[in-house]
Amino acid sequence: MLRLGLCAAALLCVCRPGAVRADCWLIEGDKGYVWLAICSQNQPPYETIPQHINSTVHDLRLNENKLKAVLYSSLNRFGNLTDLNLTKNEISYIEDGAFLGQSSLQVLQLGYNKLSNLTEGMLRGMSRLQFLFVQHNLIEVVTPTAFSECPSLISIDLSSNRLSRLDGATFASLASLMVCELAGNPFNCECDLFGFLAWLVVFNNVTKNYDRLQCESPREFAGYPLLVPRPYHSLNAITVLQAKCRNGSLPARPVSHPTPYSTDAQREPDENSGFNPDEILSVEPPASSTTDASAGPAIKLHHVTFTSATLVVIIPHPYSKMYILVQYNNSYFSDVMTLKNKKEIVTLDKLRAHTEYTFCVTSLRNSRRFNHTCLTFTTRDPVPGDLAPSTSTTTHYIMTILGCLFGMVIVLGAVYYCLRKRRMQEEKQKSVNVKKTILEMRYGADVDAGSIVHAAQKLGEPPVLPVSRMASIPSMIGEKLPTAKGLEAGLDTPKVATKGNYIEVRTGAGGDGLARPEDDLPDLENGQGSAAEISTIAKEVDKVNQIINNCIDALKLDSASFLGGGSSSGDPELAFECQSLPAAAAASSATGPGALERPSFLSPPYKESSHHPLQRQLSADAAVTRKTCSVSSSGSIKSAKVFSLDVPDHPAATGLAKGDSKYIEKGSPLNSPLDRLPLVPAGSGGGSGGGGGIHHLEVKPAYHCSEHRHSFPALYYEEGADSLSQRVSFLKPLTRSKRDSTYSQLSPRHYYSGYSSSPEYSSESTHKIWERFRPYKKHHREEVYMAAGHALRKKVQFAKDEDLHDILDYWKGVSAQQKL
């Protein structure tokens, strides 16, 4: 119960009308300024102007409250007011000087109140007031000097009041006045009103609502309009009063009178003020008039069409004031041009057909506009004979732009055509050079250039020059090794290594060669000449690799037979082909542990001739891994014996073919009598290393564990897993397709760059900008083939001695990797 009582008491306190504190909606700006304070329709309504509003407010709206009076004490603190809305209150009294503190006030709305008069004191201090709205009040008297303190008034709304008479001097001091609304007042059309009517005739009222000004008294003039658009109409008050009050003399009516217009910003009045905002902005000059040229400016219509007009403006003194030609369009106006000469011919174009236009000559002085004379005309309707306005300028611009674009397209097309033609010529020349070089590599350097070019032009014909292969040497199977005397005799005869390049080796000078297949040359017809070249070289290298492997295994087998005596029993069905080893093999002699280790067959000693040495892996011609270089795991340490085989160079005794001497380099085991191949016997079974056991001699890969110019993967053979039959099967030639012959080291699908087998030739692909954006080639794979072919061709073509064998050694490793 106690809680319910407390809640009820609190609710009564909140809902009590007397305790409610009125508030206003404020729109604030920077630095604490209040731009707008809306205190209208407050509940409860204000009876006095509230004092809690910030004094910096610019726009104060107190309409629809219950204000009774306007006092100086309640307004003096609002010094920044520019707009004050007191519409629909109960104001009946305004203190004299109540607006003295509002020197910046421009709009004052006092409509729908209970004011009975307007005096000079009530409007004192508002020198910047432009709009005064006192409509729908009870005003009966407006003193003649009521607006003397407001010289900037533009619009006055006194409609719907109780005015019966006005003095002629009431609005005479308002030079900027443009709108004076007096409709809805009960005018008494007597002679005391004639002075005001005389001013009203001269005044150029923008609204032109003359029909709304009517007389209510005396009775005989009730309903007569004060003024009408035709002033000499018989039924109007001014005509009657002119005959009655001036003895028949009509007051002089000037044809034109300067009507000032202020450029100050017009403010939209409140919607409840009883004043239509469109009527304020309705600026329509009077009808056209003619004046004396010596008295003031004059404007005449010279020529008019349905889209243009020509005006003649005459100004007697053009430099006395600043004259401007202004166009009025209902409620809007715009400046056309400044008039600086006494007589100017103004041509107006881009007009609409059958449209009324109004142009006025206006002078500007002290930021105020004065209309001197105006001209209104209507453009005529277009006829079939009239021509539309010319659009030559626009057409000229459009055609110029299109011409420039078309010219740019032509120039770019010509440049593109020239560059493409030049590029095609370069490609053609490069293709011819490649074919020429390939023919040189096939037929040798001693062939004359004319024959090569002639052969290159015949793309589909087979070669007519004989091409010899490398001489084949009979197999070593079944033959015995030469005696020790033969070996010693061979040591006494040194061999001089013959020098030759790859072309000479391929042609096989002095040897029995096989004819080259005739279907090799037509491979040049396709677009991948370099790929065919690499494939051809790879095939030849495979054959060389097979020969080298056969020779190495034959040497190991014969050495094992020599050391094992008659107890060494090999498989008689095994056949080895060695086309590069002599027919009579040399015998070996046992040497000490200090024997000089030399490289294996076709493995030259490494020279630091390259600035960028590559890490050499284990050689493919080594028969065992690094672990088998010492002692086999199948034998014991005690029975392990180290043998060395001396291979002397004795070409006369062995009967080497003349053509095979090109394969022997001066660094090979056949050249030096002191070269020894260390052989490691591996025990078998229980490790009894007697003479009756089978000894497998293995070449120690001492040299191949060092660095070399070329890096290639090695062959690994596990001694325990690989049998002799497996090794023999490895020596069988492998058949691979032409596509697989291009090794991964040179495959353009993995490396889009050139290839060079040594650092002497750069491996970077020098693509030009045009090559990257060639529209007629979607892929640069052919360029990669060309780069690889050129690099390898140069290296092989100009290689001598050790360099040649280095290349063969490299390709041997590559071939071995592919076989794995």
From Swiss-Prot:
The encoding gene: ELFN2
Organism, as annotated: Homo sapiens (Human)
Domain LRRCT, chain residue ranges per copy: 185-247
List of residues that carry Phosphoserine: 619, 668, 672
SMART domains, sorted: LRR_TYP
Leader sequence residues: 1-22
Segments on the Extracellular face: 23-397
Subcellular location: Membrane
GO cellular component, as recorded: extracellular matrix; extracellular space; postsynaptic density membrane
Function: Inhibits phosphatase activity of protein phosphatase 1 (PP1) complexes.
Residues carrying a glycan: 54, 80, 85, 117, 205, 247
Oligomer and partners: Interacts with PPP1CA.
Region (Disordered): 250-294, 508-527, 589-612, 654-677
GO molecular function: protein phosphatase inhibitor activity
Main location per the UniProt record: membrane
TM regions (residue ranges): 398-418
Higher taxonomy: Eukaryota, Metazoa, Chordata, Craniata, Vertebrata
InterPro entries: ELFN_Fn3, Leu-rich_rpt, Leu-rich_rpt_typical-subtyp, LRR_dom_sf, LRR_TM_domain-containing
Keyword check for Protease: no
Pfam families membership: Fn3_ELFN, LRR_8
Spans within the Cytoplasmic topological domain: 419-820
Protein name: Protein phosphatase 1 regulatory subunit 29
Keywords: Glycoprotein, Leucine-rich repeat, Membrane, Phosphoprotein, Protein phosphatase inhibitor, Repeat, Signal, Transmembrane, Transmembrane helix
Repeat (LRR) residue spans along the chain: 56-77, 80-101, 104-125, 128-149, 152-173
Any Gene Ontology biological process: synaptic membrane adhesion
